[in-house]
Amino acid sequence: MKLVVVGARADGGAHMVLDLIADGAPYEAVAFLDDNRALWGTTVCGVPVLGSPAHVARAVEAGAEGAVVFLGSPRDRERVGGLILAAGLHLPVVVHPRAYVAPSATLGRGTFVGAMATVSTGARVGELVMVAPTALVSHHVEVGDCAQLSPGCRLGGRSRVGRRAFLGLGATVVSARTVGDDAIVGAGAVVIADVEPETTVAGVPARTVQPRT
């Protein structure tokens, strides 16, 4: 499938997607889209940057059939995912060849699973979720749409992560705990109690830093 990649930083997700393709994934990157005007009209790793996500029609003209939305902000992924679908493009599930996804797990459209990540038995992962390299989604976990699981995250069995929640590097959620919608869990935090929606927590054990308003 020919893809447009949303997010064109050569030192970020763009390069990661191109490496995944080079590693044998059945895709071809034909264009990038990015909000950074300085990149428009340039090439990144040999692939042209055609404009912002609002210019998705240009990617369609370039032959794109689907899109990978590689943005770190959950809300941005949600917004851009809507633009992509409105343009008639597919949002394929993209799984690195060296990731493990259990046969009984489910992944929503537009979700990315990076190298050495694990999505275990009975896990249900929503749409446009970013499961970064080395993240662990244990058995019967539920992850809401547009959530971000940074590298090294660990989700214990039967835990839940809400829509648009962001888990920083190496964050851990112990078994059967819930992280609410739009919550932020800081890098290295260990969640041993439920996290309310729109709340930021950090530390070991994780404690509320501030409610988000």
For every predicted segment, state its role:
Residues A10-D11, G72-R75, R207:
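Short glycine-rich anion-binding loops that position phosphate/pyrophosphate groups of nucleotides
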Residues V5-G7, L33, F70:
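Short hydrophobic segments within beta-strands
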Residues M1-I21:
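Glycine-rich adenosine-cofactor-binding loop
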Residues V94-A202, A206-V209:
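Structural signal for interior beta-strand "rungs" in well-ordered beta-sheet cores
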Residues R37-Y100:
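Phosphate-bearing ligand-interacting subdomains
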Residues M16-D19, V44-C45, R79-L83, V125, ...:
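Short amphipathic alpha-helical segments
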Residues K2, E28-V30, G66, H90:
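Residues at the starts of beta-strands that form the adenosine-phosphate
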Residues G24-T43:
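NAD(P)-binding Rossmann-fold cofactor-contacting core
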